[in-house]
Amino acid sequence: MSVSAFNRRWAAVILEALTRHGVRHICIAPGSRSTPLTLAAAENSAFIHHTHFDERGLGHLALGLAKVSKQPVAVIVTSGTAVANLYPALIEAGLTGEKLILLTADRPPELIDCGANQAIRQPGMFASHPTHSISLPRPTQDIPARWLVSTIDHALGTLHAGGVHINCPFAEPLYGEMDDTGLSWQQRLGDWWQDDKPWLREAPRLESEKQRDWFFWRQKRGVVVAGRMSAEEGKKVTLWAQTLGWPLIGDVLSQTGQPLPCADLWLGNAKAISELQQAQIVVQLGSSLTGKRLLQWQAICEPEEYWIVDDIEGRLDPAHHRGRRLIANIADWLEQHPAEKRQPWCVEIPRLAEQAMQAVIARRDAFGEAQLAHRISDYLPEQGQLFVGNSLVVRLIDALSQLPAGYPVYSNRGASGIDGLLSTAAGVQRASGKPTLAIVGDLSALYDLNALALLRQVSAPLVLIVVNNNGGQIFSLLPTPKNERERFYLMPQNVHFEHAAAMFELKYHRPQNWQELETALADAWRTPTTTVIEMVVNDTDGAQTLQQLLAQVSHL
């Protein structure tokens, strides 16, 4: 009997089971203990294979692939700390709903807690963050193949969001020629191998029912808050709110076109807050809200009812409103709850939104990061998509820009970390094949710098704008101690990215004005390669411009 041959047959059943649940993209890091999984994935023609040498980046690459494909994405890593590097991507997926399947190779039980090399306690190491965790036994023909495949099917068939951790111990030898070992064990699955359905099919999840009193609430004064959703959902939400005559406060990730732009500016105006207090119901569609003023208003608003509609399970309401938590696909929910044509009830807010946008436009000429955030809609590629980083850049775009309705926008706004942003952007581009504009700060770029290796492999133009304000300037917006701010919060690195781009053979530009930036962009969109554009700006201008605009709009 060949241990290595049966390891591969065991792994082949696991990988084939994944294909029955829509897995097409599989991300693989190098490793020896994961050899059975890697070879099984390589031999399965249903998969599109992605590789990367850094497991943390690999997890985020999978996250980006899952964001766009809306399908589960598998990740294969070897044992030891390689597994721990998947933690950030797993956490993000749990908060934003992407489906990740983490196949982690492991030492067999007799090599754990005895000083064996590269052997750590992997079962349960992700605590409560996976939706499901499976600790498989070491491969053995004493366990029927139908147990293995039905165990996988149960976890994936009930997976609606987040990650599944499947820990896979393998004993040595890991290498060797294939023979007939375990062939009859594998063949007991019969015609399943020729089928394309799961061995075990789970019943579909029950979603929230239609709200029978909707006909009553739609006649009231309402407010629509739009969080993270798909491009198609964004367009439908805009039309729905417009028909109801309710003001729509659209997040940067809502893709609604933000019909009342600069919400995070005008929500700092007392007149706007006073008018919003008249709302009898707030319907929030989608989660992961960005704007600070929006979150502050959400925390203090007291409508008669506060409804949150999202496909992700969980509370999703840090303000703990009295109301309803409705688990449903947003587009389906809108269809179940049609709008009734009514006249808009808000008067002050549309006026304030227009005046706020005019105040932003009046400052658009200076070459700075706040101005870039406002202008970003002018620089979007046709038939493309936008990936927005975290920290200051996403807040500036949310507050100062107005993105087109239905234009795809992606970001990691679950845990809102700056780790893995370039890797996630790479996954977003690969899954869609669309021209992609990605924008991050300098510390975010440094954090995930080796992901530039992933950006060498693109199927359409990708532009990475690195806004270099020399540190974490979001802390300039916070009451951090002045004497300790630079050393302990901002942490300026005084670096530029020309040599990093050159190391990975990527195009590089460092424009000094808007004309040079626009010329670089025009050139970049012509070829299916990655271009790094480093925009060096004054350290604190972006934060100061935002604060000045907030003060100005608050007094309108």
Swiss-Prot record:
It comes from the Bacteria. It catalyses: isochorismate + 2-oxoglutarate + H(+) = 5-enolpyruvoyl-6-hydroxy-2-succinyl-cyclohex-3-ene-1-carboxylate + CO2. Pfam families: TPP_enzyme_C, TPP_enzyme_M_2, TPP_enzyme_N. Binds 1 thiamine pyrophosphate per subunit. Keywords: Magnesium, Manganese, Menaquinone biosynthesis, Metal-binding, Thiamine pyrophosphate, Transferase. Belongs to the TPP enzyme family. MenD subfamily. This is 2-succinyl-5-enolpyruvyl-6-hydroxy-3-cyclohexene-1-carboxylate synthase. It comes from Escherichia coli O17:K52:H18 (strain UMN026 / ExPEC).
